[in-house]
Amino acid sequence: MIDRYKHQQLRIGSVSPQQISAWATKILPNGEIVGEVTKPYTFHYKTNKPEKDGLFCERIFGPIKSGICACGNYRVIGDEKEDPKFCEQCGVEFVDSRIRRYQMGYIKLACPVTHVWYLKRLPSYIANLLDKPLKELEGLVYCDIESYPNFSFARPITKKPTFLRLRGLFEYEIQSWKYSIPLFFTTKGFDTFRNREIYTGAGAIREQLADLDLRIIIENSLVEWEELGEEGHTGNEWEDRKVGRRKDFLVRRVELAKHFIQSNIDPQWMVWCLLPVLPPELRPIIRIDGGKLMSSDISELYRKVIYRNNTLTDLLRTSKSTPGELVMCQEKLVQEAVDTLLDNGIRGQPMRDGHNKVYKSFSDVIEGKEGRFRETLLGKRVDYSGRSVIVVGPSLSLHRCGLPREIAIELFQTFVIRGLIRQHLASNIGVAKSKIREKEPIVWEILQEVMQGHPVLLNRAPTLHRLGIQAFQPVLVEGRAICLHPLVCKGFHADFDGDQMDFKVPLSLEAQVEARLLMFSHMNLLSPAIGDPISVPTQDMLIGLYVLTSGNHRGICVNRYNPCNRRNYQNQKRSDNSYYKYTKEPFFSNSYDAIGAYRQKRINLDSPLWLRWRLDQRVIASRETPIEVHYESLGTFYEIYGHYLIVRSLKKKILFIYIRTTVGHIALYREIEEAIQGFSRAYSYAT
């Protein structure tokens, strides 16, 4: 449905009989009103065509083939010159056959029927609103005279003396009435009394719901709740629990009444007079081998409802000669048939077919993982999507993700085909697919061009908040797993222990704009709930930062005078003997040389080294004394401290300063420095 703000939405709830009639009823061009399903038949056994006024009637639900009526005549759809727009012989409109996916019908019930979801599901909405025990209402609905009366007195509709007015004159209720009154159901003249003052079955429930004033219910419930609260504890545990349960019931009753008022729902709509019939394409008949037809369970349950409803209609037409108990039994059968259609097995033993197989009711069709909502509407499989395991991609940018080549070529295959044809590298789709199967080099070049203009959406179930689905710029990677930056894992509540994520390609221009402007991962650095940073180092990143900056903290003395420390120094085994050659800690004039030496595997990540420091950034402590002093032949000397080294001239002027560090510290420092400089430039541009 579409609201007044033109927002498409889906709302599930009770509807009025007028709304059901408006959905299912249509007026043909000749003025005939159709929509009511009166026959339990499906297809004729000789012609294999839908029966008129049956569950697959073409007059009610539309033609099976677009533009072809039941007689076989053909008209062009949408052509205004074609006249008439429906067949005068069979009454079928010349419209698109897709109308059979959404055109509904209805069954006019011979007696009111309660909706089993509102009666039997816990908590029972009908029992809560009427403030009556559920068993009493079930005895009324299902005509169980042994436990509860199967009738209810109606309010007086005239000012004349009635049995109900006479009953109200008595001070006490005569309990024997509810057993003696049904004995008069077969007497002459009782039909007038029954129709005027007595309701049975679901009709009694509907009248009681129609008499309710929801606002008065709210006021009375609040007053009673306050009175129970003022009484306090009685000291009797049983009584206190009883009072607590009553207070909880009053709260639920108030909330339910408020919901009905806010959603503008009349409580009597929980009792049906018109039963909606689903479109035939949602309960199809399939032709199997041998020419046999296999019907869906929903259609079979509809047939049972129509059979029993037609039987009740015939009994009511001959009500003068039909015993009242027989009518009530048939009303019970209609109620049970509708209950089975909506929720098979809710009242106990489910109904089965001839092969002892349980019928699949409407509740079974829509609920669960394989139901209509979760499988077909909400979580259905769509094109341009896939799923794979996620692994860490440490070399990726925050807004990028790595797609395996095998997945990417299938995901963007249509775009690659279009690119091959546009660049005249393939004459048709078949040739383009052949090039893709052979994995020619030009295919990967076009694929990379296509991926640059198409972001992908990554989602990890369950999507509990907005950051559960984010946009990324895809890049090609080897393997079969999706590579993801570890900083974005917290938003997805994901880790790299086998988690899977699905990805989709936004196709429309609006979706791509939304992905780039609102959903990119580098645009969602803060939690939308509390504003705290969401992209923070966790797990693998924390371990990596620790390893990167761990180094060797045992001090210069231990490292320098421990020749057995083979990891932190390059100890090379000589060919002439078995001892290890000791190599001094290397000196580097800048950080680029140090990182270059690490990439050439001349030093390790945590190997101590001396890095030249700027003279304007002093690291000398005021009272610190050097550990060693080395003198050169030209007069210069080195003052070696715990974590730095000073080179002085003959006149004790500081020439150079070296700090003792590792490649890991240098790499982290450079990343922080670049980030600060980038932030400073962005801030200067903004101001």
UniProtKB/Swiss-Prot annotation:
Major site of localization recorded for this protein: plastid
Note accompanying the cofactor annotation: Binds 1 Mg(2+) ion per subunit. Binds 1 Zn(2+) ion per subunit.
This protein's record includes keyword Transcription: yes
Catalytic activity: RNA(n) + a ribonucleoside 5'-triphosphate = RNA(n+1) + diphosphate
InterPro entries listed in its UniProt record: DNA-dir_RpoC_beta_prime, RNA_pol_asu, RNA_pol_N, RNA_pol_Rpb1_1, RNA_pol_Rpb1_3_sf, RNA_pol_Rpb1_clamp_domain, RNApol_RpoC1
Compartment list: Plastid, Chloroplast
A cellular component term, taken from the record's GO annotations: chloroplast
Enzyme class, UniProt record, top EC level: transferase
GO MF assignments: DNA binding; DNA-directed RNA polymerase activity; magnesium ion binding; zinc ion binding
Entry keyword set: Chloroplast, DNA-directed RNA polymerase, Magnesium, Metal-binding, Nucleotidyltransferase, Plastid, Transcription, Transferase, Zinc
UniProt superkingdom: Eukaryota
Database matches in Pfam families: RNA_pol_Rpb1_1, RNA_pol_Rpb1_2
Cofactor(s) of this protein: Mg(2+); Zn(2+)
GO biological process: DNA-templated transcription
Its job: DNA-dependent RNA polymerase catalyzes the transcription of DNA into RNA using the four ribonucleoside triphosphates as substrates.
Record HAMAP family: RNApol_bact_RpoC1
Name this protein carries in UniProt: DNA-directed RNA polymerase subunit beta'
Origin species: Solanum tuberosum
Gene: rpoC1
